[in-house]
Amino acid sequence: MGPPSSSGFYVSRAVALLLAALAAALLLALAVLAALYGRCARVQPSDLHHGGVPDAASSPRGTQEEQLPTWPPRPTREPAGTATPGHWRPPGPWDQLRLPPWLVPLHYELELWPRLRPNEFQSPTLSFTGRVNITVRCTAATARLLLHSLFLDCESAEVRGPLSSGPRDGAVGRVPVDDVWFAFDMQYMVLELGATLQPGSRYELQLSFSGLVYRDLREGLFFSIYTDQGERRALLASQMEPTFARSVFPCFDEPALKATFNITIIHHPSYGALSNMPKLGQSEKRDVNGSVWTITTFSTTPHMPTYLVALAICDYDHVSRTERGQEIRIWARKDAIANGNAAFALNITGPIFSFLEDLFNISYPLPKTDIIALPTFDNSAMENWGLLIFDESLLLMQPNDQVTDKKAVISFILSHEIGHQWFGNLVTMNWWNDIWLKEGFASYFEFGVINYFNPKFRRNEVFFSNILHHVLSEDHALVSRAVSLKVENFTETSEINELFDLFTYNKGASLARMLSSFLNENVFISALKSYLKTFSYSTAEQDDLWRHFQMVVDDQSKILLPAPVKSIMDRWTHQSGFPVITLNVSTGAMKQEPFYLGKVKNQTLLTHNDTWIVPILWIKNGITQSLVWLDKSSKIFPEMQVSDSDHDWVILNLNMTGYYRVNYDKVGWKKLKQQLEKDPKAIPVIHRLQMIDDAFSLSKNNYVEIETALDLTKYLAEEDEIIVWYAVLVNLVTKDLVFDVNNYDMYPLLKKYLLKRLISIWNMYSTVIRENVAALQDDYLALVALEKLFETACWLGLEDCLQLSRELFKNWTNHPENEIPYPIKSVVLCYGVAFGSDEEWDFLLNMYSNKTKEEERIQLTYAMSCSKDPWILHRYLEYAVTAAPFTFNETNIMEVVAESEVGRYIVKDFLINNWQAVSERYGTQSLVNLMYIIGRTISTDLQITELQQFFSNMLEEHQKLTVRAKLQTIKNKNLGNKKLNARMTAWLRKNT
């Protein structure tokens, strides 16, 4: 050590000794305090004592011969023994997202006792207790155990073993548990043992615990309040996927760690209990207060992951049927069952099971299937093995649902969840990074199931409408994510929840469809049969799937691929975005490039240099051609050249089965435009749809001129397919255009141009609405597209549309039992209010107050914002913040009002005078959302500054930079739209 510095603080030796003594005393005091406070982080062996926990659940079957050591639970949501981020601990496996591979769970004996009682559900929470015995196999010597636990108070913990291979006897030893603590960041419970577990031996972890059930949280265990037969009632249900099982019971909460489960539920006698398996038996017990509770036990499950564990406690009725010996029951509110609302779902569920059993040649392994309809369920539906959980709006038919897409929606979702019984339940992805293996294939087979039962079902067009259109609009290079991710990319549990998105479901389904298209359906299904059979009751990775496809491809000679299946498909699943395929029809030259939002001229600024191995199915002059492959960045295909003949044209991507967009040179687009104008029916509907959607998307992102897309619309007077019109209108009549008050130059031109072409399709569907609206019942594409057609016709001022709206609205207000046809109800309500007075507005308010279905209330909320009277809108906002009728999020009302032509100015003024009331209830984030809506039309930096100054006193400091950046993005978008609109206006002048 070098000499001391000339500056500093010096003390004598005596003073130094005194300071050292004081420091030691301080450290000792801190150590004592840490030990006392450490009960929140660790439980020492001296703290363990024997004895039962008052009012706690009895031991699971087979463990009642002795009590586990216990310690008092904490009565808070934060678990007893939680090591919070502020507590220091050495680095270790508890800092990793994945469990260490020391233990493999084999079997769970799980008992849960939620304290749900009739007429006692005023509190937002209720308590539950439970016990779980987990039989595990040790794979590596360890004196430390990790398993998942979140928001649970661990009341006792014991490790028994090693277990003998024969029947259980009393000679099983115990492994001392020296310490129990929680690593909150990664949601682990850690057991420090006094001895080492031996590889190859089996042990039993015995844990008792308690926690809280939250009302409407819909994670783990939750309870809901609803109305049935005129009475308020409560039910309890579960949602374990993806990582919420750990908040219900300590477990090894990873999908690969499958085990069998014996589940016991203790519940009030006035309720029934459901779980994955059939009921095995019932008995009774009394709690410390003498109250009687029912103990319901269930049969042993197959091997399954923790995320499929399910239970429900409710006072429901059911309807049932048997399909191939399997009992199928649908449970719902007693009113709903009595009214026959579950009949449609019940009638199609069995046949869907049978179809998939036959398709995969694998029987459904459970003896029963229960499907329960919850009054509200944010996850829409969940495929739990043996107990599927649905939001009732997606399972039950109402009497007024006849002219809606409800039957199709129920069919889609039931097919999806039943498909999971094979993809996900029988064969589970090894980890969440490959979640598309279950969600993508379940989404894909929705369409095969429905097409089987309804051969007239227009599978390609509906797939585009439901799946492809949405994901192609969101997926692009650099920003979006890949379908399959590397496990090491995940660092937090919250990232798993983010995987349930368009890329998992829609892109996953689209890639499965593309794979099927270039292999053919027989090869595709044969490979899936092999995959499902091999990995039944086990787990698989993406490479396992590719291996089975390769095996089937290698066993035949008809399908020849340019590369192994893995090499082809990994490009699509591991890379983000998708390619744009551009064909020069004069030379046959084809190239691929990544699709970007707002392509820039200097492509070197972008770093996405990936290519794909692209299957090109194509047609020439209406005739299907042989499959070719674009397996590098560019390639020449002489067979794709076209002559000067007006009858010579080429379309790539047959039936839109490839996951890419298609561009052509100017000659190629011109040929297609000419064919549309000469004989549009020569081009299949799916390709008229494709050309419109591709051309507008490519024009908005600088791949082609906007005039190229607009040229394709000239033929529309001859277009009688409403789904093609839908593609035109969603691309041409956008929300930005409708709400832009500066579009006065374009509007009259667009009105004249579109009405001239739209009148034919309008007359067709307006006649159906007036004379035989029931005819729409089985036309799914019309039910999907009609609202946009109706909305646009009225926005363009078509008098017949406005008159029909007035007729339907007046008929409904005079006789509310005469329902407005569902597909156009929102539009009719809006125009009824817009052209009405406060009398019509008050009528809707009264209807809102008497509606219980959230979907209907949302429609009415939107319609009431359509008023053009400032005083009515101001009163609406007052009601939203201060009056009783609006029990949902009042900021939604302000947002829908702000989006209206008159309302944006009313909301701005209202916020000046009422921000305190709004901010206290909803915080500044609601203000930020409103700011973006109000700022939708900004186009200068001065407008940004003015808007920020207006809101400056209401924003928190950390939000100001974010908001300015967002407003700058809006400004740039608006400037781009302004330039685009100017070019569209010029084109309309020439062609109107």
UniProtKB/Swiss-Prot annotation:
User: Which tissues express it?
Assistant: Expressed in skin. Expression levels do not differ between dark and light skin areas.
Q: List the glycosylation sites.
A: N133, N262, N289, N347, N361, N489, N584, N602, N609, N655, N811, N850, N889
Name where it mostly resides. Answer: membrane
State a GO cellular component annotated for this protein. Answer: extracellular space
Among Gene3D superfamilies, the record links this protein to: 1.25.50.20, 2.60.40.1910, Neutral Protease Domain 2, tricorn interacting facor f3 domain
- What InterPro entries does the database record attribute to this sequence? Aminopeptidase_N-like_N, Aminopeptidase_N-like_N_sf, ERAP1-like_C_dom, M1_APN-typ, Peptidase_M1, Peptidase_M1_aminopeptidases, Peptidase_M1_dom, Peptidase_M4/M1_CTD_sf
Which cofactor(s) does the record list? Zn(2+)
Q: Where is this site: Transition state stabilizer?
A: Y505
**Top-level class of the enzyme under EC nomenclature:** hydrolase
Question: Sorted alphabetically, which keywords does the UniProt record give?
Answer: Aminopeptidase, Developmental protein, Glycoprotein, Hydrolase, Membrane, Metal-binding, Metalloprotease, Protease, Signal-anchor, Transmembrane, Transmembrane helix, Zinc
Which biological process terms from the Gene Ontology are attached to this UniProt entry? Answer: peptide catabolic process; proteolysis
Q: How does it sit in the membrane?
A: Single-pass type II membrane protein
Q: Does the keyword Hydrolase apply?
A: yes
Q: Quote the record's cofactor note.
A: Binds 1 zinc ion per subunit.
As for family, the record states: Belongs to the peptidase M1 family.
Name this protein carries in UniProt: Aminopeptidase Q
Q: Which organism is it from?
A: Acinonyx jubatus (Cheetah)
